[in-house]
A protein has these predicted regions:
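Active-site cofactor/co-catalyst pockets and adjacent glycine-rich loops in catalytic enzymes
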Residues: 1-82
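A short, polar/proline- and glycine-enriched secondary-structure boundary/capping micro-motif
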Residues: 86-90
Length: 90
């Protein structure tokens, strides 16, 4: 993620995903799995995670969001929403 942003002189300091589900009761600090630089927690099989690649800048923004079920061989998407770019003009 950051390697691509570096090409455009952008930086994302916040995480790009986190664990969700009944086993991860929410709180403001969460203190569970987060996808961020230097994260050391392994993602266990059967975990459910929300990946949110977003940038919100002055005058523009973008966001990609996907909920995934982690499997032994990779992941399964939890939604079937079409994956298209939706351009919204102000």
């Amino acid at each position: 993620w950051q390697v691509v942003l570096d090409r455009y002189g952008l930086e994302k300091k916040s995480r790009i995903g986190y664990s969700i589900g009944a086993a991860y009761a929410p709180d403001w600090g969460e203190h569970t799995l987060s996808f961020r630089p230097n994260e050391t927690v392994l993602v266990p099989e059967n975990a459910v995670v929300h990946i949110i690649l977003g940038m919100w800048m002055d005058g523009w923004g973008m966001e990609l969001s996907e909920t995934l079920h982690v499997t032994e061989s990779g992941y399964t998407k939890m939604t079937d929403f079409p994956q298209h770019v939706h351009l919204v003009q102000p």
